[in-house]
Amino acid sequence: MMKSSELEKKKVLVLGTAKSGIAAATYLVKAGAVVTVNDGGTPSENDVQTLESLKVETLFGSHPLSLLDGTDLIVKNPGIPYQIPLLQKALELGIPVWTEVELAYRSTKADWVAITGSNGKTTTTTLVHELLKRGSKRVHLAGNIGFPAVEVAQQAEAGDVIVIELSSFQLMGIESFCPVSAAFLNLSPAHLDYHGDVTSYAAAKARIFSNMDEAGRLVVNADDEEVMRLSETAAAERLTFSRRQDAYAHIENDMIFVGQTEILPVRELALGGGHNLENVLAALTLIEPFGISLTAIQDVLRTFGGVAHRTEYIGEFAGRKVYNDSKATNNVATEAALSGFQSPIIWICGGLERGADLTPLKSAMTHVKHVIGLGETGQRFADLATEQQIASTVTREMEEAVATAFDVSKPGDIILLSPASASWDQYKTYEERGEHFIRSVQKVGGMMK
């Protein structure tokens, strides 16, 4: 743990505002650091007011290299790419560049449970949090689905547990971060515009276990060859999970096992879908050392229905069942969603163009009846449909896409938003996209008989 006094009078540049930047700046000011906050864009009015109250130096609209003069440390927003000249120069000068997670880790004596992977992070993290809440320790949820890590760390004490979902962006900026229990769920090409290539992306993910020793527990997917290969170098105890083969956590005659312990029949899980079964196996292996009672575990598994925007059932409108899977920002997540239905699917997809190969989606399109392309990649998805001899429509915005979905569907069909693309061409977050979808469904579907 880093003492606050170690930051006193240190010159720290906080790069980027939003939640994590504001939280980092607030902590650093309290620790006595000399803080400058820089954002290449225009921060929100609330962020500006907060920074004014902190009495820190600010510079918005650009990233001049002069900001590095005398700087001892940079704490960056995870989304800011390392390719910008300011960060390239900082690395050249040997200035440490952290994400807020590293700062948070150094500021508390609490234990950390961390989850990464291309898909399933949010569901697994939320489930782990729910399970650990049934134990004897105080548990905190941090990161993308909770409060900023450094904010949570200030509330956590020795003996507490912080559960955190970690992206490759966040893991790029760790130095000493070391969880007591970590999961590497799966790996598929994503964020290549940020990392440059699959190798760099995979290496960033693997950093989750880079500081772990034999006292730690690393949970990995036995069915993912690349995850298994990458984790061979881990010093931590490596335990596997699989829904297809023998592993430490596995399925046998419809029964979930962790080690030799029978947990629950699969049919009793509230959480549906094969991919979610993998998330359950990973979560159970992660929390095993914490001594949660079997009765408590079973109670959570029978009631935990998942998270918003992840194959979320919205309801039935005019005989059509509608699902919001806005969090599916890559092929693997969307493949899992498409494969989970047997009824005809009206598939709304598309978003930010990242140059991803859409070919792998073909095998999951068996039940797709109509493809509705949306956003920058909308036409590419329509072209994919044509290749599969499936009808398609390209639309400009969400309400038009939803109206089209109801027009081309009939009672008994599934309307599924599963974009296989990031949201940033039209929305700030996948949550904003999902909420717009839900409002559009309620508006359009509510007018139909």
From Swiss-Prot:
Top-level enzyme category: ligase
One GO process term, biological-process aspect: cell wall organization
Reaction equation(s) it catalyzes: UDP-N-acetyl-alpha-D-muramoyl-L-alanine + D-glutamate + ATP = UDP-N-acetyl-alpha-D-muramoyl-L-alanyl-D-glutamate + ADP + phosphate + H(+)
UniProt GO MF annotations: ATP binding; UDP-N-acetylmuramoylalanine-D-glutamate ligase activity
Species in which this protein is naturally found: Exiguobacterium sibiricum (strain DSM 17290 / CCUG 55495 / CIP 109462 / JCM 13490 / 255-15)
Name this polypeptide is given: UDP-N-acetylmuramoylalanine--D-glutamate ligase
GO cellular component: cytoplasm
Highest rank taxon of the organism: Bacteria
Principal location listed in the UniProt entry: cytoplasm
Record's keyword terms, sorted: ATP-binding, Cell cycle, Cell division, Cell shape, Cell wall biogenesis/degradation, Cytoplasm, Ligase, Nucleotide-binding, Peptidoglycan synthesis
